Amino acid sequence: MATVILVRHGRSTANTAGILAGRQAGVSLDDVGRGQAESTGQRLAVVPLVEVVTSPLERCKQTAAAIIAAQSGKPRRSTERGITECDYGDWQGRALKTLAKEPLWKVVQTQPSAAAFPGGESMTAMQARAVAAVRRRDAAIEAEHGPGAVWVAVSHGDVIKSVLADALGMHLDLFQRIHVDPASVSIIRYTATRPFVMASNTHAGDLSWLVPPPAKTSKSRKRASADAAVGGGAGPSPVPSSPHS
């Protein structure tokens, strides 16, 4: 079971201006966003990542660069169009306070499965291609690096919310109940029977429990169970810290 860490890009210049950026060019992290990306990179530094996959948009590339810079190893970096921002079409580049007056706004809020942006894509199509991309990448990474592999997908708010909703078995019409902040960390572990959502929209906390255990030489090594922990379980075992000299 590989593990994917979903990271939303840090705060962007469009976020600060109250603009729905979509896929328009020229949107990058602002000063706060760069600091957020660096902080998230430091938080993930304890976890040896095998790959950092990013949306092709600049704000995500900048966030991915900060995560890679904090790694002691050299995780592979790649771009995945399947996790790019929703194509908001004619809504792109417009002020959110203006868009809130549009009839479609209420549909986006209450029945997103029926929302299709004029000149763009539907939210159902966005979820379908994002979930397919994450699951495909996860399976490929596990096949290459083994079930203990941990990787990062740097993407966008609505995209990450839709992936989390799928993992939780939620209908897309309920996905607005999920909140995903800039530079936040959410964690999913896919298995043959079900996905496990290990964390959602976190900003702090130790992540050393994601570090894979040392490889065993025995061919009889047990694969991690895909069963849920009835009663909740004891939680992850922390990685012992190195003794101080």
Would you name each region that the model predicts?
Residues 11-67, 116-132:
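Loop-to-helix element that buttresses phosphate recognition and phosphoryl-transfer chemistry
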